[in-house]
């Protein structure tokens, strides 16, 4: 983990343009604000190109996708590519329906993502690996290393596969991350917020490898820190403490361990 990346985010407060799902907007916005970034949730086709052009990163998340939003996502992504602005693509539930899969195919035909992030089931679907999924959730793991590498090679992008052990594949390197807590898997939008944190880190002056590892490991560390506080007894009490923990520095999260 590179502490300087987190410091850069808090110094620059990067604007992250979210084209994300309705379920997680509030959680993603507050989590990113706590971390140090600045969220904007603009999806209207009339303004997405202008918003994307002034943003420091663009996040595309298809969790509650509509046909109108698909048009906006492609427009924002293409604008970001034109201006060399990093793009994170989160293909939420892509394995669930043909509508979602066709939408992701259209996005990837026109937009070059810097990073594709998803769970094992979602990313396995992108490379036609048969892995069981339930709605937007993965209920199998498969070989995450193989899935990450195949997605990276197919789309020429860095990849983050989330799970009990996260897998990052970037520049022909595999990285494994074991930080985190099982409460995250019981909270709607925890993976979506991770996308926001990654997007913020993509705006810093560092290598893509360090940006991804820092974002993923810090996020998991924040979760384990929050879960271990005396006033946390379940997911309901965990949530506000987790949001608070995202504003801390890594050394604060490991004190006393």
From Swiss-Prot:
Enzyme Commission number: 2.7.1.50
Similarity section: Belongs to the Thz kinase family.
Residues the entry annotates as binding ATP: 117, 162
InterPro entries per record: Hyethyz_kinase, Ribokinase-like
SUPFAM superfamilies: Ribokinase-like
Protein name: Hydroxyethylthiazole kinase 1
Catalysed transformations (reactions): 5-(2-hydroxyethyl)-4-methylthiazole + ATP = 4-methyl-5-(2-phosphooxyethyl)-thiazole + ADP + H(+)
Coiled-coil features, chain-numbered ranges: none
Top-level taxon of the source organism: Bacteria
Biological processes annotated in GO: thiamine biosynthetic process; thiamine diphosphate biosynthetic process
Pathway(s) where this gene product acts: Cofactor biosynthesis; thiamine diphosphate biosynthesis; 4-methyl-5-(2-phosphoethyl)-thiazole from 5-(2-hydroxyethyl)-4-methylthiazole: step 1/1
Job description of the protein: Catalyzes the phosphorylation of the hydroxyl group of 4-methyl-5-beta-hydroxyethylthiazole (THZ).
């Amino acid at each position: 983990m590179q502490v300087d990346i987190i410091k850069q985010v808090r110094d620059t407060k990067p604007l992250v343009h979210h084209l994300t799902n309705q379920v997680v907007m509030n959680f993603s916005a507050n989590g990113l604000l706590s971390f140090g970034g600045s969220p904007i949730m603009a999806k209207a086709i009339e303004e997405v190109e202008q918003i994307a052009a002034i943003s420091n990163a663009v996040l595309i998340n298809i969790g509650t996708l509509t046909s109108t939003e698909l048009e906006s996502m492609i427009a924002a992504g293409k604008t970001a590519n034109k201006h060399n602005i990093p793009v994170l693509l989160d293909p939420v539930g892509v394995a669930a329906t043909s509508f979602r899969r066709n939408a992701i195919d259209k996005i990837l035909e026109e937009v070059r993502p810097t990073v594709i992030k998803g769970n094992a089931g979602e990313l396995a679907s992108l490379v036609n690996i048969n892995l069981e999924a339930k709605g937007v959730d993965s209920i199998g793991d498969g070989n995450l290393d193989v899935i990450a590498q195949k997605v990276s090679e197919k789309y020429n992008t860095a990849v983050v596969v989330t799970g009990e052990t996260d897998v990052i594949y970037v520049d022909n390197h595999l990285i494994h991350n074991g930080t985190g807590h099982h409460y995250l898997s019981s909270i709607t939008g925890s993976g979506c917020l991770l996308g926001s944190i990654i997007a913020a880190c993509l705006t810093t002056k560092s290598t893509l490898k360090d940006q991804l590892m820092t974002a993923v490991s810090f996020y998991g560390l924040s979760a384990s820190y929050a879960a271990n506080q005396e006033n946390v007894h379940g997911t309901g009490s965990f949530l506000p403490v987790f949001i608070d923990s995202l504003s801390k520095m890594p050394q604060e999260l490991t004190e006393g361990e």
